[in-house]
Amino acid sequence: MYAHENRLTAWHIGIAFVALMVGMLLGPLQTWEHAGLNLYPALRSIGIQSYYQGLTIHGILNALVFTTFFITGFLTFATTHSLKRASKYPWVHTLALVVMFAGLLITAVPLLLNGATVLYTFYPPLKADPAFYIGLTLVVVGSWITGYGLLFTWSAWKKENPGVQTPLIAFASLITMVMWQICTVGVAVEMLALNIPTFITLFGYGYRNVYELDELVRVTDPRLSFEGTVAAKK
C-alpha cells in the first residue's frame, strides 16, 4: 500500500543523512583551523581549497540540504501512514524528489569548483556562481511540490472520510509543511531578486544597488562581519 511512499521516504532521508555525514566531516577542519592546524592543502586533490570553501559546503549540507530533504521525506511518511492512505498523486512526489536532487547536483558543481565560497550558506554581498543560487532555489521549489502532494492526499482523504477529524500526526505534518512553505518564500525571493543576476538587476534592483545604499555595509568585509558575529555568540 505504501511501497511508493516508503521508497521516496528512503531516498529523501538517505540523501539527507549522506549530506549530514559529509558536512560533519568538514566541521572538525574548522576547529583545527582555529587551533592553528591547517589541513586544507592536503584536501585540494578532492576539491576543498580553503577554510571558507569548507565552511560554505558544511553550512549548505548541514543547514539546508539535510534539513530540507529530511523534512520532505519524514512528512511524506508521517502523513500517508497517519491517514492510512497512499498518495493521491504519486507522480507529484516523484517530481518533487527529481527537482530537489537536480537542484542539489547543480548546487554541488560551483561548490566543488570553489565558485560559491560565500560563508555559512550564503551571505550577500559575497557573490557566487548563478548556478549555486539556481540549484538551491530548485531544492526549495521541490520541497514545495512535496507539500502540494501532501495537501492533495489530505483533500482526497477528507472526501473519503466526511466528518472525521484529521489524525493528529497528519494534521501536525501538514501544518509543519505549510509553515515551511511560508518561511521559505523569503529564501526563494532573495535568490531570485537579489542573488541571481537576472533581468531584475537590469532595472537597478539587484543586490549590488541594495547594499550600496548603506555605506557601512558596502565597505565592511562580510567575512569579518561573520567572524565577529560568531565570536560575539561565543
Language-model segment annotations:
Residues M1-Y2, S82-K88:
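Helix-loop boundary elements of multi-pass alpha-helical membrane proteins
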Residues G47, K159-P162, N195, G204:
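Short, flexible coil/linker elements and helix-boundary hinge sites characteristic
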Residues M1-T9:
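Cytosolic juxtamembrane amphipathic/interface segments immediately preceding
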Residues A42-R44, Y120-P124, P197-V217:
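Membrane-interfacial helical/loop segments at transmembrane boundaries in membrane proteins
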Residues T9-L37, Q49-S82, P90-A116, A131-W154, ...:
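Hydrophobic cores of alpha-helical transmembrane segments in multi-pass integral membrane proteins
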Residues E5, K158-F171:
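Hydrophobic, small-residue-rich membrane helices and short re-entrant helix-turn-helix hairpins
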